[in-house]
Amino acid sequence: MENQEKYNNLSRLVEKLKKSDDPKRKYEYILWLGKKLKEPDNVIFVEENKVKGCVSEVFVKANIKGGKLFWEGYSDALITKGLLAFLITGLNELTPNEVVKIDKKLSLIHI
């Protein structure tokens, strides 16, 4: 992956989860991230930002400033909110091209 430092936030989060073999600790960490997620502006709560097909109420919005993505999100379910916080923290301030190039080894699938 080019310019690895751009992906430090995502790498740090993935490594934190990989460190523990205890699923309960991983779950608690995701819940903790969800509790820390900043409440978004009310403008996010529109139909076009709603994640379709999810049992929980989930809203996600990306804004581009200076060529970089800045994410906002909300979920009424804490585990979903934690996963959303994981992605927002890991993907914030990357360019769209950088997001597309993320190595699959950093994905949640491998944790």
Residue ranges and their predicted role:
Residues 3-14, 18-57, 64-65:
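N-terminal intrinsically disordered, cationic/polar leader segments
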Residues 60-61, 72:
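Helix-adjacent hinge/juxtasegments
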Residues 65-66, 97:
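A short, structured loop/turn motif at beta-sheet edges
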Residues 68-77:
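A short glycine/serine-rich beta->alpha loop
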Residues 80:
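Hydrophobic (often cysteine-bearing) scaffold residues that line and stabilize catalytic clefts
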Residues 83-95:
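Alpha-helical support elements that line or immediately flank enzyme active sites
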Residues 93-106:
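Glycine-rich phosphate/pyrophosphate-binding loops
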Residues 109-111:
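Conserved small/polar residues in nucleotide/adenosyl-binding loops
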